[in-house]
Amino acid sequence: MFGFFKHKTAAPFTGEQCTVDISENGITINGLKLDVLVHLDAAVKLLGTPRGTKYKTDSDCEEFLEETHGKGAVSNRVNYTWDELGIYCYTMNGKVIHCFGFMFANDPELALKHAPEKMFRGTLTINGEPWQQAIKRGENCDIIRVLPLGVYSVTAEYSDPFGGEDPDDGGYNCVEVQLAE
């Protein structure tokens, strides 16, 4: 954990009890609202202590990320994972969360270091509607489906985009919410 947290705390609820709604107003988890961008401390207070995975950013990647997120925005990339909940997030500076993710299936070919040990087992909705139904109104972008939602963008990554007649046929690996670019 790199010594990020002095005291480890568990989430005050189980993965099955986790209820998440994504809306134009942010993310609501078990009745408590979080914005994206949000300081890590707010997420820790709500979800418990995560596991951290630090990433070295090579110069090409840093240049791309700074073009996207602003000069100096990429200083200490750390992804955090709440293994028991199936939730993860991305930071560019180790403290400000710019993307939340909910993992439904972990593609072994990707071998993501920050993939949760358990998959998300709670309830996920978009504007109160089941996410699988709502995301279909988004744009099909070959390997993901993207749904604009006010200042946010919700993306769902296909498990097997080329395995059926429709990319949605193979299911999804994860759903992420971030500020729209």
Where would I find each of the regions flagged by the language model?
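Short helix/turn-capping signatures at newly exposed starts of structured segments
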Residues: 2-181
